[in-house]
From Swiss-Prot:
This is Fluoride-specific ion channel FluC 2. The chain crosses the membrane at residues 11-31, 43-63, 69-89, 93-113. HAMAP family: FluC. The keyword Acetylation does not apply. Na(+) is not transported, but it plays an essential structural role and its presence is essential for fluoride channel function. GO terms for molecular function: fluoride channel activity; metal ion binding. It comes from Methanosarcina barkeri (strain Fusaro / DSM 804). It catalyses: fluoride(in) = fluoride(out). It comes from the Archaea. The lineage of its organism: Archaea, Methanobacteriati, Methanobacteriota, Stenosarchaea group, Methanomicrobia. Na(+) binds at G76, T79. It is a multi-pass membrane protein. Pfam families: CRCB (PF02537). One of its GO terms (cellular component) is plasma membrane. Fluoride-specific ion channel. Important for reducing fluoride concentration in the cell, thus reducing its toxicity.
Amino acid sequence: MSSTYKDLDKIFLIGAGGFLGAICRFSLCELMESYYGTLSVNVLGSFMLGLIMYDTEYIGFIGPKGKLAFGTGFMGAFTTFSTFAVQSFTMPFFPALENISVNLFLALVGVFMGRSTIKALSGREV
């Protein structure tokens, strides 16, 4: 198979994952107010990306194609740094500071929890 076809395969996987991730983000944000919807997708996305990245490194259940589809495609479209930035920019100073602090802290906690889950499942030091 030529490299062009391999690249098309990767592009399709990322695009399909992105399509589903965008739909899921839209659906979840429609259920909540904008601030809470954005916070929810970013924290959930950080947890899920933590699972995906550490799984591909230590367990291998997802595999390279799954990492492209779910890690790059789905999570790239599901999470939304730009919406978080615009929402923070348009808020008064102290609510914006709270929004920034809560988003960053909980996103890092999400990655930590994803990593901890993989560590527990693999039985290895991660």
